[in-house]
């Protein structure tokens, strides 16, 4: 039979009876200082008010504890974490592919796609693909990518200049700050 694992005490916050310090500084829910006292006295104050005693900072001397409703405090922290996660935007790399013999309208469509990606905060990888002997005309592809960078000057800055990788020529653009 496998041994029963105890719940890890480190993951649980120091509240009420779990506070193990000889003296603590106690702060009220509204921020007023109640003074330095033993944890048992602070627990009595918290019990009178039907609140919890929560360890705020164990680095201070003496450690700081606050009398508050722990359930409400935990809910507020989780809510703040959710809001921060919503606002966080991961920057993806979006690719715009074309050939060096691209027509004007098709080129404009690619530029508009790149603009849209850059406005949404994503990086853009502009790729010009070669087929067969087209690779001999890599200077035309480089000129096309430089033209694209010039057209997107208001929205982007070149992160990596046009460079050949195998049968492709690639340029990276990142949104302007």
UniProtKB/Swiss-Prot annotation:
Assigned keywords, A-Z: Cytoplasm, Initiation factor, Protein biosynthesis
Keyword Protein biosynthesis annotated: yes
Ranges annotated as spanning the membrane: none
Subcellular location: Cytoplasm
Segments forming a coiled coil: none
GO biological process per UniProt: ribosome disassembly
PANTHER family named in the record: TRANSLATION INITIATION FACTOR IF-3 (PTHR10938), TRANSLATION INITIATION FACTOR IF-3, MITOCHONDRIAL (PTHR10938:SF0)
UniProt protein name: Translation initiation factor IF-3
């Amino acid at each position: 039979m496998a041994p029963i694992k105890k719940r890890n005490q480190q993951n649980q916050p120091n509240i009420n009876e779990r506070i193990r310090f000889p003296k603590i500084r106690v702060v009220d829910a509204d921020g007023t200082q109640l003074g330095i006292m033993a944890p048992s006295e602070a627990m009595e104050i918290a019990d009178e008010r039907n609140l919890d005693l929560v360890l705020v900072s164990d680095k201070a001397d003496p450690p700081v504890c606050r009398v508050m409703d722990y359930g409400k405090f935990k809910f507020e922290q989780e809510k703040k974490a959710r809001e921060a996660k919503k606002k966080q935007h991961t920057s993806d790399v979006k690719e715009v592919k074309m050939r060096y013999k691209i027509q004007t309208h098709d080129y404009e469509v690619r530029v508009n796609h790149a603009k849209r990606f850059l406005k949404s905060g994503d990086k853009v990888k502009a790729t010009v693909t070669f087929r067969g002997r087209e690779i001999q005309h890599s200077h035309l592809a480089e000129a096309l990518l430089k033209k694209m960078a010039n057209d997107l000057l208001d929205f982007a800055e070149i992160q990596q200049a046009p460079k050949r990788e195998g049968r492709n020529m690639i340029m990276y653009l990142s949104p302007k700050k």
